[in-house]
Design a protein with these regions (language model features):
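A short helix->loop->beta-strand "cap" motif at the edges of active sites that frequently abuts
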Residues: 117, 174, 323-327
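Internal gly/pro-rich beta-alpha loop/helix module
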Residues: 129-242
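ATP-dependent carboxylate-amine ligase catalytic core
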Residues: 2-21, 27-115, 119, 123-147, ...
Length: 451
């Protein structure tokens, strides 16, 4: 299958160079200008797509080269951008930064190569003159097929930009697409897992509007759209997805404590016949009625542990449901919620042991899980690409999977049973289609269990 898909990848020279701010400014400016735009994020990050969604009013896809083969990457990109004027893809870390310090595997560069996407590089030019060009020279010559077609200078001044732009275009033949000056009043706060979530930024809309207004003055949006339209059509074989059976109802925990979900994973469950019913472990007293499954995603339960403990009614409701065999997927924060306690605050108590602050990132990054037993989602021996990103650890993290990092380091993790997956690793259902099918099928069995 071949699909036209105008697209543009916003990459950065390094983490902290301003690519998220620049991406958000561009998205908001395009939306305000009447351009129909889609958004995507390289890698497994949950938070940046939340900002994209707030701006464009639609989901943002994760394009993860560790999770997906070429067909899936291109399918998700084409599906998300269908009918849009352009898709703006935000990179992750520095352009060439991948797994390990000496590899570009799973990098933004790899996404650009595998999706044939033209790239605009964000370069932090604060306090720099000719040195900014030296940095650009390095990026342009590090890889022959670098796909860099334009540059945006972040932190640049209106006085410096014309000279630097002229030098960039004359020396390198890439397009200078504008600049974004320092705007400290529009900065986005961070915490240990990156930016704070979009829902926690009280004045997010105002900040985005200020960024967009400035971008309309200083960034050549027409040039960006021209670069996006230069992207070749996407060629791929779409996955075979069909709903096989009657619909089921899956409760999905969605509030400030549980907000880490891949929107494409949720969309896949819907395509397989699931109705997703949101509920809040923070504020609801009980689970929704007539559920056939439960999905507890990640998030920040440790920040809301006192409130989660105080809601004893829904903790009891969830414990009773899981213990009676309601099919349940609980990732990271959802897994923590099923343990006995978080930092001394009582949780659902389905699983033994408590969770504690490890004081540093724990088992951070990509890993491949190998199932050690047959379970609801996975057959023994199946391998699953996964990701961990957390500072909190558990006394009993489970041992039903062997996790192995690309470096070779390995450990046992997670719980897997006939009706349960619970563990720190996150995975994407589009990287594990059979797991999504099995989850929905388990929910169908639950639906008929009491008939």
């Amino acid at each position: 299958m071949q699909k036209a898909a105008p697209r543009l990848l916003i990459a950065g020279t390094n983490s902290g160079c301003g690519k998220t701010t620049v991406t958000c400014a561009i998205l908001q400016a395009l939306v305000d200008g009447g351009v129909s735009v889609a958004a995507a994020k390289c890698g497994p990050d949950y938070i940046d797509p939340m900002f994209h969604r707030e701006i464009i009013g639609a989901k943002s896809s994760n394009l993860d080269p560790f999770f997906f083969d070429d067909d899936t990457l291109r399918f998700l990109l084409a599906q998300n951008g269908a009918g849009k004027d352009a898709t703006v893809i935000e990179g992750v870390m520095g352009y060439y930064d991948g797994i390990g310090l000496d590899s570009s595997r799973a990098s933004t560069f790899e996404v650009a190569q595998r999706t044939e996407s033209p790239v605009v590089l964000v370069l932090n030019a604060k306090g720099a003159g000719l040195s900014a060009l030296a940095v650009l020279d390095g990026f342009l010559h590090f890889a022959t097929e670098n796909r860099i077609r334009g540059v945006i200078l972040n932190g640049c001044t209106a006085m410096s930009y014309p000279t630097l732009a002229r030098a960039i275009e004359e020396r390198f033949g890439v397009r200078a697409c504008g600049f974004l000056p320092q705007m400290p009043d529009c900065s986005l706060e961070s915490r240990h897992l990156g930016l704070i979530t979009a829902a926690e930024v009280d004045d997010l809309k105002e900040k985005m509007q200020r960024l967009a207004a400035k971008a309309q003055e200083t960034i050549d949006l027409d040039a960006l759209l021209q670069i996006a339209k230069s992207a070749p059509p996407l060629t791929f074989t779409p996955p075979d997805i069909s709903a096989a059976g009657e619909h089921v109802r899956i409760g999905v925990a969605r509030d400030r404590a549980f907000c880490f979900y891949y929107e494409d994973s949720l969309e896949l469950l819907r395509r397989l016949g699931a109705e997703l019913v949101p509920f809040s472990p923070l504020s609801d007293e009980r689970l929704p009625e007539d559920l056939h499954g439960l999905y507890l995603g990640g998030g920040y339960p440790e920040l809301y542990a006192e409130r989660l403990e105080a809601n004893a009614a829904i903790r009891a409701s969830i414990r009773a449901a899981v213990e009676r065999g309601l099919p349940c997927v609980a990732e990271c924060g959802g897994f923590m919620y099923l343990t006995q306690s978080i930092a001394g605050h009582a949780m659902a108590g389905v699983l033994s042991g408590s969770c504690f602050d490890a004081g540093k990132l724990t088992r951070f990054g990509y890993a491949t899980l190998t199932a050690q037993r047959d379970s609801m989602l996975f057959a023994a021996g199946e391998q699953i690409p996964a990701h961990e990103f957390h500072r909190w650890d558990a006394e009993n993290p489970g041992e039903d999977f062997l996790a192995e990092k690309p470096s070779g380091r390995s450990w046992r993790c997670a719980y897997a049973g006939e009706t349960l997956y619970a563990g720190y690793p996150h995975f994407h259902f589009y990287a594990n289609l059979s797991a999504a099918v099995r989850f929905v099928e388990a929910c169908r069995k639950e639906k008929h269990r009491y008939e």
